[in-house]
């Protein structure tokens, strides 16, 4: 026994080699700072980001083409299906983000989600490959829809793969940012770039999906397209396995929603108690951290905002003389909270308007995905002897996003830092405002293009069948301005939200905060669903009636 104890002491990692933020390995031991984390670990997570985004966009972005042209569903039903799948998948990210923060490591959520994703892809490949799951071809203006059996199999594969993607998206963001120690100035500086590079990888996956994979599905076949996507996903997951040993992890610290609820209850119970004149008299734990259970959450300084919530941290009686066990009893009874816990709720409430306003940008993005793609499908899409698929037009927006990221990070960032003094050139709030400005400009440009499209259809008396066959005498290049403007929006608003939420939310809400930045994109699915429906049950995409 003595020799075993000596061996354990010899192999224990010295404090100077440990990560300053308390990161651990997958086995629960302290991580070696020199052998884990940073870009070495993040690069393997970027592989997961790439294949997840590639497959998800390649399926959902071209989903309306499959539902309308192969399953023979009407355009409204196809668009609604896209909205339902995307919306349910993204709302599920809240649940997975909560689980990763409260109960298990983000790594295990990612691992389980990849398995679910893989199963969903198998179902999708089978649904587009087996003859009895593919309805007969139809070239008429109105075709009988696929049977409920065929639709159910396809939608089951969509839903399962969507749930897998929902588990990957927020947790890979939080796990990726955990690879950089914020207590180390050098690593913290590198970590600031993590979200920008994440968006670059994400947009690169989108570019490949909307060009090569959309072409595979439309011109070669959905069987070949889906099979290639599944193979790419499996290959990416296998590659990412080699990076497991480099990953750093943070222990879950309990339910963050419980803390928020405690503050509300305690503030309500103490609403009659007067606030102290000095904020330092409010209750807070001693030391640098403020977490009751695991003592890991860094303290947040008291602020003068939303002072009515400070009542949750008001001590009864003589604050200095109250024994610590009495304070702990009050905490357990939800009658007392720390200043840090109160400030966490303040952060959530103050960021809500920012989160809600971000929806307006994604309203414009939603139109690009459904309305814009179907808009282009009726136009002239010839490039020489090659006719590109309608959804491929989205690559213009993606290329614009990649260009903006490169220009901002390598050209504009340095002079902007000197001008504003902000380490990221422009603050997240300013970039959010710019993103919303470009979103408004996008909608204006889209309206002008639609006015032109309608006038051309009416001038040439084009029928619905001619629109479906892409016979509108109008070049698809008309939609390029709105797509380029939309390309500026995504990296501006997307990276701003990720940076702001990671900066403001506490350590026990990292995955949940990342999920919130993703969910906001699909809150517009409901509005898109309502706006896309007309009294006759169809989208505003058919040929307008003359007169």
Which residue stretches match the model-derived regions?
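Hydrophobic transmembrane alpha-helices of multi-pass solute transporters/permeases
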Residues: 2-136, 144-547
């Amino acid at each position: 026994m003595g020799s075993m104890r000596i061996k354990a002491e010899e192999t224990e990692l010295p404090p100077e080699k440990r990560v300053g933020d308390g990161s651990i390995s997958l086995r629960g031991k302290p991580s070696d700072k020199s052998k884990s984390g940073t870009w070495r670990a993040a690069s393997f997570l970027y592989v997961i980001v790439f294949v997840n985004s590639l497959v998800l966009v390649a399926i959902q972005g071209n989903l309306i083409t499959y539902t309308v042209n192969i399953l023979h569903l009407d355009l409204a039903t196809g668009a609604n299906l896209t909205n339902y799948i995307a919306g349910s998948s993204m709302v599920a990210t809240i649940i997975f983000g909560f689980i990763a923060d409260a109960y298990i490591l983000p790594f295990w959520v990612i691992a389980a989600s990849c398995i679910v994703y893989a199963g969903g892809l198998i179902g999708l490949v089978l649904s587009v490959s087996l003859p009895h799951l593919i309805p007969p071809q139809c070239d008429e203006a109105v075709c009988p829809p696929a049977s409920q059996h065929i639709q159910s199999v396809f939608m089951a594969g969509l839903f399962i793969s969507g749930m897998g993607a929902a588990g990957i998206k927020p947790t890979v963001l939080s796990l990726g940012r955990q690879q950089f120690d914020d207590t180390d100035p050098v690593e913290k500086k590198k970590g600031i770039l993590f979200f920008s590079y994440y968006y670059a990888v994400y947009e690169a996956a989108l570019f490949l999906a909307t060009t090569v994979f959309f072409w595979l599905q439309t011109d070669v076949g959905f069987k070949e397209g889906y099979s290639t996507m599944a193979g790419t996903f499996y290959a990416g997951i296998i590659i990412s396995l080699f990076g497991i040993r480099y990953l750093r992890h943070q222990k879950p610290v309990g339910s963050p929603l419980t803390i928020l609820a405690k503050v509300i209850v305690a503030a309500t119970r103490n609403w009659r108690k007067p606030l102290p004149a000095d904020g330092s008299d409010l209750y807070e734990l001693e030391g640098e951290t403020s977490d009751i259970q695991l003592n890991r959450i860094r303290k947040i300084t008291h602020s003068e905002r939303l002072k009515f919530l400070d009542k949750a941290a008001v001590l009864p009686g003589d604050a200095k003389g109250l024994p610590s066990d009495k304070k702990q009893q009050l905490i357990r009874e939800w009658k007392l909270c720390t200043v840090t816990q109160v400030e966490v709720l303040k952060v959530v409430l103050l960021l809500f308007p920012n989160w809600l306003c971000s929806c307006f940008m994604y309203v414009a993005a939603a139109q690009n995905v459904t309305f814009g793609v179907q808009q282009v499908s009726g136009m002239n899409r010839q490039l020489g002897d090659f006719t590109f698929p309608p959804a491929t037009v989205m690559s213009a927006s993606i290329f614009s996003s990649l260009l903006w990221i490169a220009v901002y990070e390598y050209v504009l960032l340095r002079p902007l830092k000197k001008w504003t003094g902000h380490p990221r050139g422009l603050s997240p709030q300013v970039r959010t405002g710019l993103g919303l400005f470009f979103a408004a400009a996008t909608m204006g440009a889209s309206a002008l293009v639609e006015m032109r499209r309608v006038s051309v259809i009416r001038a040439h008396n084009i029928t619905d069948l001619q629109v479906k066959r892409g016979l509108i005498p109008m070049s698809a290049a008309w939609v390029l301005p709105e797509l380029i403007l939309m390309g500026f929006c995504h990296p501006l608003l997307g990276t701003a939200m990720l940076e702001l939420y990671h900066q403001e939310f506490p350590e026990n809400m990292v995955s949940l905060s990342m999920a919130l930045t993703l969910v906001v994109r699909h809150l517009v699915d409901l509005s898109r669903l309502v706006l896309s429906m007309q009294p006759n049950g169809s989208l505003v995409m058919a040929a307008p009636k003359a007169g």
